[in-house]
Amino acid sequence: MATMPGLPMFGHGQVEGFEEKYGMEYRRPYRDEAPDAELVERHGREIFPLLKKRYLFADVERFLLYDFVAPDGSVNENVFAYSNGTAGERALVLYNNAYARADGSIRVSCPYAVKDSGGKKLETRDLAWALGLVPGEGRYLLFREERTNLWYIRRSAELARSGLRVHLEGFGCQVFLDAHEIEDDAFGHYRALHDRLGGAGTGDVAAAIQDIFLADLYAAFAEAAGPALVRRLCERLGAFEPKPAPEEAQPAAEPPTEAKARAKAAPDDAKADR
């Protein structure tokens, strides 16, 4: 609802998870219900950020629906897939309205009516057009999944040719935002990132590229600080281990004087007298 065109309507108590439903004519609720803290937290984490992006979803000028095509070529009617956006920012939404998981791809939109001089005609658009891609060698699409905050990368030419392949768990959804096309640099950074991720996502694109191209340096540091080197250093330092300091000499016992000798013997003399 938060990503569909038009005005989203929230019922009373929907965010809090209240079961009692009543209209504006009610002065007070009949039930004393407590808000569902987990449901409120999920709305704050998953729904409210999308409501702040309503400018991407409210209009219909760029709204397109897609058939979700399964690997066997059939259309999975349980999956809702659509794109929308503005001239400079695009969004793509997929939702699986079933318990069974869904695997498939989207490439071409469903036909929609367009007015022309002779009345109306049906047209379709492909996903590459919807995302503003200019397919070509060395061009890539970067886009972020809102719920997981992971970035994904795909070849623009592959998206135009085969579409976007998606896996959705039962009642799962994916909302892709911040989609933008980039051209690879002379060092092939984005090609290397695409090949390394293999379709998976990353939390930080720049850090992932850095990890790839500094992998040899990281390995050298890891080897330098590895157990073998530490063992050799310990062995080397052990050869020059300082000798323990000699124990301090105890002061020589003072020779007993005649008075001390008599005092020491006094208890024994007292016992003898008894």
Feature locations, PLM:
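Carbohydrate-interacting/catalytic domains
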Residues: A2-P5, M9-F10, Q14-R274
